[in-house]
Amino acid sequence: MELIPNLSIETWVLLVTSLVLFYIYGTYSHGLFKKLGIPGPKPLPLLGTIFNYYDGMWKFDEDCYKKYGKIWGFYEGPQPILAIMDPEIIKIVLVKECYSVFTNRRFFGPVGFMKKAITISEDEEWKRLRTLLSPTFTSGKLKEMFPIMRQYGDILVRNLRREEEKGEPISMKDIFGAYSMDVITGTSFGVNVDSLNNPQDPFVQKAKKILKFKIFDPFLLSIILFPFLTPIYEMLNFSIFPRDSMNFFKKFVKRMKKERLASNQKNRVDFLQLMMNTQNSKGQESQKALSDLEMAAQAVIFIFGGYDATSTSISLIMYELATHPDVQKKLQDEIDRTLPNKAPVTYDALMDMEYLDMVVNESLRLYPIAIRLERVSKKDVEINGVFIPKGTVVMIPIYPLHRNPEYWPEPQEFCPERFSKENKGNIDPYIYMPFGNGPRNCIGMRFALISIKLAVIGVLQNFTVQPCEETQIPLKISREPIFQPEKPIILKVVSRDKPRTGS
């Protein structure tokens, strides 16, 4: 039996030529960083360094910093990515050269109509969307929206009390996931879902489906390894976002808009109405107003950016408070002083709680919402002696930056005092960036912080959280691309109304 197939010379030539071309494609960009004198892990043909993500992007970034220092290069398939942890260069990338060179995030896609979302849009379209949407997130608008958010904080407390009375440990993600979903649906669309008690609600189901990303999903891998397939996928109407969810939200926004126009509801205070108002503003140029498709794209991004990130952040704060009872007690004391006799929280009271702000900031340092920031270089540029070719993705690894012992003494420890009034002014804004920095930072930062703080106040006014047998200590981080704990955070919740037992 012959081991080598009996093929014609022409077939062999074609086969060998194909393999050579395939190898050239899989390695043509992989010499870039070596040529520039930038260290980094050795890439594999075609794959680059993507298999190094097996233990998680955050772990890969942390390991690279320890091995290579503040600057290193690696490859996702053929795409060169330059990692930067130097605060001076970070400032230039995110702020000084934002408009001229580093305006855009990496286009990762096919994404369908989500190209029109503020987080994905580019250059002039992004500037236009940012200009139109920024007034929606001002302190004044959020203050108007606060009563809507507070009602969901009250529902959170009721749901938590009902769970606490069962006497069983509670999954934080279940409770706070429902709260986050309710806040987003209520403030975005004026819809009351009560997602904890109505998990089969189509709104909840379609929203959760958007968030199911796996780093080694074959479809995503094909986009990373063969980026030239993206326009083909777009022609075939493929998308990294689930089609049924996208169609649901397109139709939903269209229906809601139609109903509001028919009933002349112009005084509602939610994001959909505020976006609709851009279409009707007298001083607004017609070509600048948001289209219906753009409104749908922003609505999906609010869900995508708000639901999972907010609920995970609150869950992690509760974990740290449960494992640091002294911090929890100090925070409860501040809440009780500010809101005696469980008085309803006000916007101004929430904004004035200094220790609450310290606790939230420290938790976001340890567990940043986004573990990476990315910008694409629009042209060749040299920054502080580092040459960055056009098309290179500049990546800022937030996780190791927030835990860098050069900037943070005992970086693995939970210590809210780092963010006290005395210390906060000494923190470089380019080493602490839970919501990014510069003109393209997270537009929903204030909204997210209010949502988080409102939940923390509601819980600690009424309950004390404690670790239990099911609590994973120490906490381990998942290897999935969306930052989350490896296992659900399970805690015991005890009502503060119950009389204390024992001495």
Curated annotation (Swiss-Prot):
Its main location: endoplasmic reticulum. Pfam families: p450. Coiled coil: none annotated. Heme binds at residue 442. Disulfide bonds: none annotated. Its EC number is 1.14.14.1. It is a peripheral membrane protein. Belongs to the cytochrome P450 family. Induction: P450 can be induced to high levels in liver and other tissues by various foreign compounds, including drugs, pesticides, and carcinogens. This is Cytochrome P450 3A25. It comes from Mus musculus (Mouse). One of its GO terms (biological process) is response to bacterium. Keywords: Endoplasmic reticulum, Heme, Iron, Membrane, Metal-binding, Microsome, Monooxygenase, Oxidoreductase. It comes from the Eukaryota. It catalyses: an organic molecule + reduced [NADPH--hemoprotein reductase] + O2 = an alcohol + oxidized [NADPH--hemoprotein reductase] + H2O + H(+).
